[in-house]
């Protein structure tokens, strides 16, 4: 929604510039985790005469105690959670990419296995666990669920989201992947793989974690083309593999629970049981001497931006 801040404001919905880091309100999330919302923060939110929209792809990682803290501190506002429900088989690939963007180093298979080993306890695989928690904290009527896969199939995600927050859709609204000037577009899996490798290098050698690598990679992409980025991309592209995801047992289990327990708050439900193909980079590229050389050159360039 960052691209649409002025258009939202015209209809009375504030998307604050406060707490913005990269593409969302990540600083607000961190303040919630640290129990560090100041009197000024609370006053800004509590005393606003307009509705306020906060968004961060990482709010989902907060636990019940975190949300209870937010509810108790922001005591002059009715907090409504808008949750985009994606079937686990499709979602895990996207969530893994977000983990990498924020400093993760796990391969997709490693990340997926940690959840798949205990599917009934994973809030990533069993969406009902997270949703029940939201209703417990904020109330049953303060949850709106958007069927992401339904919206995606109709190319209506932004429209459906705006409907959920009572905003009238206009063609002037920015849709990220259709606009060359939009922020927070999805990244090619090849670049995700390069960032994953860089995350490991900078965490081990420079104690640099979080989204710093992704931020610098995006900012310096043009310059990195002169340091072997194109050549490294080509090496990784040559070793991509395709796997099918979706229509898993855990998807069927979650689907049944969702349509029985949350039918009244799902905005645009449509059954989803198709199988999709995703691409993954094999880690074998790291054994390629040429790839190692290009990665070292890219690392050297990014190292120049480390604080002294």
Please name every model-derived segment.
Residues 1-308:
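Anion-recognition interface
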């Amino acid at each position: 929604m960052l691209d649409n801040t002025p258009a939202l404001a015209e209809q009375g919905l504030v998307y604050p510039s406060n707490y913005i880091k990269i593409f969302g309100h990540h600083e607000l999330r961190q303040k919630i985790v640290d129990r560090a919302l100041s009197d000024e923060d609370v006053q800004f939110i509590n005393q606003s005469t307009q509705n306020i929209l906060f968004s961060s792809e990482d709010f989902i990682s907060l636990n019940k105690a975190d949300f209870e803290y937010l509810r108790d501190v922001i005591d002059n506002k009715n907090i409504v959670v808008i949750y985009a429900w994606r079937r686990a088989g499709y979602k895990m690939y996207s969530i893994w990419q977000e983990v990498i963007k924020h400093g993760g180093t796990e391969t997709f298979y490693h990340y997926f296995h940690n959840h798949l080993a205990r599917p009934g306890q994973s809030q990533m695989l069993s969406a009902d666990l997270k949703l029940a928690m939201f209703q417990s904290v904020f109330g049953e009527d303060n949850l709106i669920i958007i069927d992401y896969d339904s919206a995606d199939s109709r190319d209506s995600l932004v429209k459906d989201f705006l409907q959920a927050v009572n905003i009238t859709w206009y063609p002037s609204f920015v849709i990220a992947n259709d606009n060359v000037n939009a922020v927070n577009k999805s990244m090619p899996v090849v670049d995700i793989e390069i960032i994953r490798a860089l995350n490991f290098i900078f965490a081990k050698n420079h104690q640099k974690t979080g989204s710093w690598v992704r931020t610098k990679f995006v900012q310096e992409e043009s310059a990195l083309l002169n340091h072997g980025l194109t050549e490294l991309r080509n090496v990784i592209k040559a070793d991509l593999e395709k796997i099918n995801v979706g229509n898993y047992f855990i998807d069927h289990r979650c689907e049944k629970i969702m349509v029985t327990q949350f039918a009244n708050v799902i905005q645009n439900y449509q059954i989803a049981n198709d199988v999709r193909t995703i691409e993954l980079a094999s880690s074998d590229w790291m054994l390629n001497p040429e790839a190692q050389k290009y990665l070292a050159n890219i690392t050297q360039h990014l190292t120049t931006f480390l604080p002294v």
